[in-house]
């Protein structure tokens, strides 16, 4: 079995070879190398042709009544690493700045344990590409990867959290992560000389009014005790100071803790865009793309069981956490299969997606121990 030091070395290697969504070829090869060294007696491995960097590993149980799924993500971010670590990224401009190297290492540790300790139930480990973008979970589902013996009856997954103490398990009933929608807005007016505004139609003025109007959606259309966010983080317009811009481009994101809230915000944004178009005589083209980034809604019964187990396990430090407005594409899979997502504390001053993120590696073994004990307990249960 993999020891703690071996697991840390695995994490270091994974950290050095980060790859972007759907490009995780080196990561895939290394994962297959590690998995190939495990005991194979009751393992089956699927490398799907239509999603070639994905890996599914089935652990056949001794007397299964269900298949317990566990998912980990394997892609990285377009971030230039600034940690100064001796095992820093060797791929320029790409970094495991969201801790997916930790996620993979924990998953490998849990898989290795059950490769050596055959469980009662079947287990399904899904090493998923393209979480940060390209909606890898949705792709996998729509490609039919979870059909037949590869279908989980329930799905679990974790995300590292630098705001929690090392090794802490955090979870909650209900929504853990927000759903997200990408927003792209093009405002089309008419360019012209700055000295003759009456002969042009200023896209910058219309875009500015649109941005200000959007700020009223959350404050006046959403219940104040519920959480919703619209951030318009990018505005591009114009080429020179004395030319009225005929085109402005706005990009942003919508976040909501329920699908209903996201759809409400989407509708109100459409209303605002239509109003600005009429008010300023411009064309406003709005594109909304949610893809597979639905809210991560934990199944009530399974999550209650998970929380009770963690609370009553003396080896686990458990805390209840608030919903997070960050997105996670595991939400799509949880819309198809009941399951639970939870946090693993990795205690660091840096936040997720920052170039200096350095997760505390003491969380790896603690995460593995908590998961193996829970999956063993769950596998022995006869009830649904």
Swiss-Prot record:
Keywords, comma-separated and alphabetical: Amino-acid biosynthesis, Diaminopimelate biosynthesis, Hydrolase, Lysine biosynthesis
Pathway(s) served: Amino-acid biosynthesis; L-lysine biosynthesis via DAP pathway; LL-2,6-diaminopimelate from (S)-tetrahydrodipicolinate (acetylase route): step 3/3
Reactions mediated catalytically: N-acetyl-(2S,6S)-2,6-diaminopimelate + H2O = (2S,6S)-2,6-diaminopimelate + acetate
Top EC category: hydrolase
Record-annotated active site: 73, 132
Claim: Amino-acid biosynthesis is one of the keywords in the record: yes
BP term (GO), one: diaminopimelate biosynthetic process
Coiled coil, from the record: none
CDD domains: M20_Acy1_YkuR-like (cd05670)
Purpose: Catalyzes the conversion of N-acetyl-diaminopimelate to diaminopimelate and acetate.
Protein name: N-acetyldiaminopimelate deacetylase
Source organism: Limosilactobacillus fermentum (strain NBRC 3956 / LMG 18251)
Higher taxonomy: Bacteria, Bacillati, Bacillota, Bacilli, Lactobacillales
């Amino acid at each position: 079995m993999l020891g703690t030091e071996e697991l840390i070395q695995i994490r270091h290697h994974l950290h050095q070879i980060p790859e972007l969504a759907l490009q995780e070829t080196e990561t895939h090869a290394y994962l297959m190398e590690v998995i190939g060294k495990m005991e194979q007696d009751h393992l089956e491995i699927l490398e799907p042709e239509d999603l070639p960097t994905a890996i599914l590993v089935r652990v056949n149980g001794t007397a299964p009544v269900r298949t317990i799924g566990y998912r980990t993500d394997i892609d990285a971010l377009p971030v230039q690493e600034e940690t100064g670590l001796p095992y820093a990224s060797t791929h320029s401009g790409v970094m495991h700045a969201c801790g997916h190297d930790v996620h993979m290492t924990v998953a490998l540790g849990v898989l290795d344990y059950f490769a050596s300790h055959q469980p009662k139930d079947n287990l399904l480990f899904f090493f998923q590409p393209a979480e940060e973008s390209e909606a890898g979970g949705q792709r996998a589902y729509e490609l039919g990867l979870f059909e037949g013996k590869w279908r989980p009856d329930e799905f679990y997954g974790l995300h590292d959290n630098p705001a929690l103490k090392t090794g802490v398990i955090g979870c909650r009933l209900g929504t853990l992560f927000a759903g997200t929608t990408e927003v792209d807005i093009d405002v089309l007016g008419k360019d012209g000389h700055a000295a003759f505004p009456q002969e042009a139609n200023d896209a910058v003025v219309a875009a500015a009014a649109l941005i200000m109007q959007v700020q009223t959606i959350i404050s006046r259309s959403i219940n104040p005790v519920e959480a919703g966010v619209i951030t318009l983080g990018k505005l591009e317009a114009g080429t020179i100071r004395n030319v009225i811009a005929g085109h402005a481009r706005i990009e942003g994101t919508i976040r909501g803790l329920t699908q209903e809230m996201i759809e409400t915000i989407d509708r109100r944004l459409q209303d605002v865009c239509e109003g600005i178009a009429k008010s300023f005589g411009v064309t406003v083209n709005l594109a909304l793309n949610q893809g597979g980034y639905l809210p991560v809604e934990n199944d009530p019964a399974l999550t209650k069981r998970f929380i009770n187990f963690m609370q009553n396990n003396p080896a686990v430090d458990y805390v209840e956490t608030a919903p997070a407005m960050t997105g996670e594409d595991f939400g799509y899979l949880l819309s198809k299969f009941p399951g639970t997502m939870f946090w693993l504390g990795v205690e660091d001053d840096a936040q997720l997606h920052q170039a200096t993120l350095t997760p505390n590696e003491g969380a790896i073994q603690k995460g593995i121990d908590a998961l193996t004990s829970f999956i063993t307990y769950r596998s022995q249960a006869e009830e649904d």
